[in-house]
């Protein structure tokens, strides 16, 4: 089974669009909603960006849990950036969110990169060496797992395999080729792999993308807004049917 998600439109002055998109998606059957964690959209410091946790908390407090076999709805970050706030603060934010949606919070974590470094620098927030940021990420991931939360670590690099294994986390990749997903999901480590990326613009490509990811072993396909929730849910059903028919093993099995 492949679950579906959307990344909410939070590069706005108000949360209205994010709330509307979330309620539409969840009512249609999308499994989860996610938020970016940026001070501004990449390369656009003059544009607004809403913080993820207030948005997710408001939704978690107002949306009822479902009783279907798919569980949900899930609320997560894609991804929360280690280093923007101290680890203990980020841990507290996730634990607080989990009080509103027990068992349904996904702590997507990342270290940031050269594209997001300017956000730190603009506000005087240290941007440590990559190894230091990765160490902080694994430390936080372990603490979150200790609290019973689901954790995704961002990055498709081979080094992230060891980090995910050390933390007991899944691996999440952004706009990666299904071949990379398959390599990570069906390798000797048998990691859980989730996928996020922009929604295809061409008609018919959404279903093809979701089906390819399901065949590769991805357990989630999360698309940036805008994406048609009804088409996304239909694509996941088609992918599940196709995977069941082909007898493809699930990742980690």
Roles of regions detected by a PLM:
Residues 1-253:
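Active-site-adjacent structural elements that line small-molecule/cofactor binding pockets in enzymes
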């Amino acid at each position: 089974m492949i679950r579906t998600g959307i990344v909410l439109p939070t590069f706005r002055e108000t949360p209205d669009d994010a709330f509307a998109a979330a309620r539409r998606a969840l009512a249609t059957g999308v499994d989860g909603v996610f938020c970016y964690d940026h001070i501004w959209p990449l390369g656009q410091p003059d544009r607004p960006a809403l913080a993820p946790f207030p948005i997710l908390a408001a939704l978690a407090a107002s949306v009822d849990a479902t009783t279907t076999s798919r569980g949900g709805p899930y609320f997560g970050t894609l991804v929360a950036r280690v280093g923007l706030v101290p680890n203990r603060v980020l841990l507290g934010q996730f634990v607080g969110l989990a009080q509103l949606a027990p068992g349904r919070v996904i702590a997507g974590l990342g270290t940031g990169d050269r594209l997001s470094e300017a956000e730190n620098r603009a506000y005087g927030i240290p941007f440590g060496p990559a190894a230091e940021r990765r160490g902080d990420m694994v430390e936080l991931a372990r603490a979150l797992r200790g609290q019973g939360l689901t954790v995704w670590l961002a990055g498709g690099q081979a080094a992230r395999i060891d980090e995910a294994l050390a933390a007991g986390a899944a691996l999440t990749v952004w706009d990666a080729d299904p071949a990379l997903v398959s390599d990570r999901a069906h390798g000797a480590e048998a990691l859980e792999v989730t996928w996020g990326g922009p929604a295809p613009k061409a008609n018919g490509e959404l279903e093809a993308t979701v089906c390819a990811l399901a065949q590769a072993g991805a357990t989630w396909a999360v698309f940036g807004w805008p994406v048609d929730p009804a088409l996304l849910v239909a694509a996941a059903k088609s992918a599940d049917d196709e995977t069941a028919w082909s007898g493809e093993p699930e990742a980690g099995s």
